[in-house]
């Protein structure tokens, strides 16, 4: 376990990297004994510093939801980070690429809660009952820690690599559509790069919401009404650069477009 002083030091480094859109050396290279618990402590100190600076928390992101990603990182469950109000874009947005580091895009669904959701025994049915609506979303990944050799400890510390999200226009209640079969066809500059289906996220995209409620219970917290939960990607990340035009077709849930400037 890392000392509180080291946790605070690393959180400060990440806050500065976020401010300057830069990258710091791997935490696990400097502190090889750092644990997942340490990484959530670092994320928590960073989060609290951002709230103290005036940013408003609007929701949570869930990452590492696919079996392949979990096996690749040697973990057995997803991870999570926080989302602030100044990181939310609407379809059609122009997004400054130099606001982020190691910029990639993932295809996801987001869920808006209509009432609080609390563990420890939250199920998929409980999560679906708590969801007001689903909306298509693109996640902009933003890594402030060098990618080579990075582990889950580095990623969680770095707010689970969350940078921003772009929300679509189509809202669907969970009883209006079989969310497992929502498709995603992701294009860059007119060329299809990635495809997937939402069932690739833990078998059902809302499963992660139940997992998150149970995980939060371990930390003495719950998910609150009106929080946005970004539920995990059902495609591989796609790299983007300045000038790229991105389009994702979600079939019955419409499309999302954005341009990186």
List the model feature ranges, each with a label.
Residues 94-95, 217-219, 247-248:
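Short, intrinsically disordered/low-complexity patches at protein termini
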Residues 209-237:
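A conserved acidic, glycine/proline-rich C-terminal tail/linker
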Residues 2-204, 245, 253-261:
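Catalytic-core "active-site belt" of small-molecule-metabolizing enzymes
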Residues 232-236, 240-248:
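Low-complexity, intrinsically disordered Gly/Pro/Thr-rich segments
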